């Protein structure tokens, strides 16, 4: 992907200079764990000398884009991804530092705990993972932007996409609490609990707009640099596992 990006970006700085500096947006698609490839793409764009005026993302693209928009460099993002305890983050386990040794040993026997309701025998909160640990991480990483803010006033103007399960509509975040917007955009249905916000039930934006070029254009972009890491469509016979169906949503 790096070489394809270089081929596409090689002459763009000259085009921008000749055109009187039009606005450039980077659009980052959803794509599950493959979304970390967005970090490498941003590094290539920077190395090519392309100015970035807007960042728009969905799902994992919203996470990378949101952090990049407030000043994280690709190198910092890469280090952050590699330094995380993903088993802990992708669970509702308490922080090991706050757990007694006996309880910690019991919890480490299981990769994933599923909270069932004894009354209804259903998975609680419409998702296996409530996402508290991820939400806490996002809040920490966005320190200084924890109040409701206008995303157009971030160091790089930003927007991300979610879906309102109440009516199936697309929700584009242009303002609000940045960590909440990022968490809403990657709430994979059936995996992460949705985010309740202002009467909406928000989940991963991948089904309504997984590659939000239109959002970037509406923000004022003249040129779009799109980074699409979506998986190719699977045949019906290939959708055999629940994880296949879940990941196809992003």
Identify the role of each PLM range:
Residues 1-7:
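Bacterial N-terminal signal peptides that target proteins for export
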